[in-house]
């Protein structure tokens, strides 16, 4: 009821390293919200350590992307290839694994439930 109301969502700006994915608490518009999300979407794994992944429960669908480039500011945790990505973020039940080769880097994506 706090997060979704007729497809209206409250936006939150927070440091992901301070969030516990299995029991998120954050304040928005002066209201403390506690929620366990069904899905976790991280499209920039290369910008952070793996603690966000470790805090997720195995019943939360994880949709994540990373890349293999350390040539950009803030890329502190790139993966060298798709196999490195899968080892760093192991999934028990995988719905999708893929990569997209671009001129600047290769982008990796996984969707599934963690071990």
What residues fall within each predicted segment?
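S-adenosyl-L-methionine
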Residues: 2-43
